[in-house]
Curated annotation (Swiss-Prot):
It comes from Methylobacterium sp. (strain 4-46). This is Fructose-1,6-bisphosphatase class 1. Pathway: Carbohydrate biosynthesis; gluconeogenesis. It is found in: Cytoplasm. It comes from the Bacteria.
Amino acid sequence: MGLGSRLDACLAREVAGGDRPIAAVLAALAEAAAGTGRLLRDGGADAGPDDLDAAVQARFVAALRETPTALLALPEAEAPLALMPDGAIAVALTPLDGRENLAGNQPAGTLFSLRPAAGAPFREPGRIQVAAGFVTYGPRTELAVTWGAGARIFTLDPSGAFRLSREAVAIPPTSTLYAIDAANARFWEAPMRAFVEDCLRGSEGPRGQDFAMGWCASLAVGAQRALCRGGVHILPGETRRGRANGATRLIHEAAPIALVMEAAGGAATDGRDARILDLPTLDLQQRTPLVFGSAEEVACVGKYHDGRRHTGARSPLFGQRGLLRA
């Protein structure tokens, strides 16, 4: 399909036969995302946080009820919501990611994952996903998605239709961009400190080039940036209590991002040597460290964790310094 093609036309042509339930669910998610984009654009973000979350979630749930979705896993729910008893698809959904950004007129997003409903779909590793993607609500509402035929980006047009704006998206293998929440530096493990410190040293450090750092408190927005510009987005495990495995939900967030990244030639790991799509799932609310983006940059982070790049003692960029101590 050529640029400008409607999402529904692409689905009708490429997702046929026994895969029609996938097409129906993706079309419903796109419809709900289009409505969410209009809601946020027209002032819906001014509603109270709880009201906005409820409105967006209700929009997606209503759309999925009309599709062959058997189970719907939502971020705060202890158990999946049963929708259609004989449905073929199980969906994991984060309806509104990065809601806090909206108060400052910054982008937010939605993440989704489709799995076969047979058996125990949310007890299986992410590699069983049949489709996944994320939506970003910013100057444009864009849908990044894969259903097994590479990664594509569709842009919402004024009529309310998603149209193909980028096909066969390919993440550059290397980049000088990295994203990490530096406010949590004191909780990072030593290899992560070493990686960031070497990036901060730029051309004078061991990596021999200057880097740019950015951070946006939305996984969907970070994934969109990595998809379009490359680089590495890092949500590490931390030393503080309860954060050894990070804060990213494996089923709702890490798995769909990983499927899209790999479809575009990128990578997604736990920061060490474990591919996100291979991680065993033990719990619906399971968390994982997450590193994704350009394949070579993701691998570089792993080298610091396995000792191939981490050299132990470092200069005190992240030391205990301040006005009252050296």
